[in-house]
Amino acid sequence: MRSAFLSKLQTHAPVAQPQVISSGLAKEAGDLPQEQEVDAEDQLSADAQDGVRKIQATTQVWSKGHLIFAYVMIWVITFVDTMQQGMSNSLLPYVTSSFRLHSLTASTMIMSNIIGGLIKLPLAKVLDIWGRPQGFLIMVGALTIGLVMMAACNNVKTYAAAQVFYWVGYNGMSYTISIFIADTSALKNRALMFAFVSSPYIATVWVGGPLATVFLNGPGFRWGYGAFAIITPAITCPLYAVFAWNYKKAKDAGLLPEKTHSRTFTQSLKHYFFEFDIIGIILLASGLALFLLPFSLYSYQKDQWRSSLVISMIIVGGLLLIAFALYEKYRAPVCFIPFELLFDRTVLGACILAASLFVSFYIWDSYFSSFLQIVNDLSITQASYIVNIYSIGACFWSIIVGILVRWSGRFKWLALYFGVPLTILGVGLMITFRQPDVNIGYIIMCQIFIAFAGGTCVITEQMAVMAATSHQYVAVVLAVESMFANIGGAIGQTVAAAIWTGVFPQRLAEYLPDEAKANATLIYGDLTVQKSYPVGSLERIAINRAYGDGQKYMLIGGTAILAVGLGATMMWRDIKVKDFKQVKGLVV
């Protein structure tokens, strides 16, 4: 689901003035405003930023038909994007293998995950200051540029750069849609609406593998990306149009009086430079990238860990992270991360859970498709079905979770007593079952466990951060939660790549028969070469054993980190969302 995990997965009636603490966070469940108290105040929030006021005005003037149309278009956009995601996931090992660098499958995603996660906090400011439609349009543009670059790439460096553009755009677009849902749904219905929007995964999961096969066996992977570079802008335009039309309608109705600013162009540049904390973003993104990338790239250096490049990247990355912390505390006029929101234990706990889930997920998932194709001798299509059990199960189960949240009015119990424990069970069992000569049915069973658990955790962690704050801060806390998830994903991919590059080539060289040892480097770097050896041959058995050893260490690490997530879930307040109304206007 969020890209599904992830991606990971991912309101306006008249309201009474919410009771909030100084940071804008809601108090304990007993202090939340009651639904009966919020009957007749249609005016816009006086202290809200321009983007929030714009969406409040928009939802007061649009019709029920426009609201339904917007949700239908969001579903269609999600359908197309998830279909493209499924295809891309199946193509990725072949794209990197085409450059003889299959082991960089995880590395190509590390930088994109870091930047894709960090971009959401500045994007939250864009949405709150300038408006939702503007942010949506910018992100669609970035996504399209990424697809065009992937279609035209001739080396793994260009492909990695394309991944950055793509994931910035995709994560940003998904995030904007999440904010739209938060703007247009009552809190008690929000989990169900998030689940509805993610439901296309249930259908598109069956299409990704066959679609990748069609392009690989036909015009090539480049046309796979090129086709969606045309389709994506076409299907996103109607949603932007309905946003823009109703904003104009609200403006014409006088709900949004013009604001004049006396700043010059230079003053505006300076204002937004500090408002978006550009220095902080550069320090954090550069520091994380330089610190994490060497763990997956060291095996390509002659001296490996003793390489001056690897050592200098780790040291400089660490120093930049320290510089970021010092700058944010002592020098930044506007902090990149809203630390005052993180003081709330529910927000902090949800963010830590998101990070730990993504660390775990990307540790065990990064080479899962390759494992299935090599060790279990599955086709791309068959492997995609098993990999995507998570997407199917999580999206289906999230609908059940949404109904349970609406019925019970609470969400903590679902994560604490079901979601996180079942995730630990599913990942832990795979330590034994994801090995050569083990019946694939056991792997499928574990995937189902993790899928139902994931559908619970993703929805409840998002509900936790939204329920703990007022409408004014929803965009920010969702951005913070997503940033933790994406950085967790980057860390998980780093750990996966480090384990893979440290274990697989060493065990491969150890297990290969003497006559094949000269080809170890070629086998290590190319999935198609690995598949070329017949099943049952000494070379294929050696490759399978090396895969099994690498997977075992990945799964041990993925299971261990989940203990942090269980503790984080215990931190949440047990907020009753039935009694809490955040939004204005016509909502679901």
UniProtKB/Swiss-Prot annotation:
Chief localisation class: membrane
Expression induction: Expression is induced during iron deprivation.
Keyword ATP-binding belongs to the record: no
Pfam families: MFS_1
Glycosylation, residue list: N519
Keywords annotated in UniProt: Glycoprotein, Membrane, Transmembrane, Transmembrane helix, Transport
Transmembrane regions: 60-80, 104-124, 133-153, 161-181, 191-211, 225-245, 278-298, 307-327, 348-368, 385-405, 413-433, 440-460, 473-495, 552-572
Family to which the UniProt record says this protein belongs: Belongs to the major facilitator superfamily.
Reported function: Major facilitator transporter involved in siderophore transport.
Protein name: MFS siderochrome iron transporter 1
Organism encoding this protein: Ajellomyces capsulatus
Gene name per UniProt: MFS2
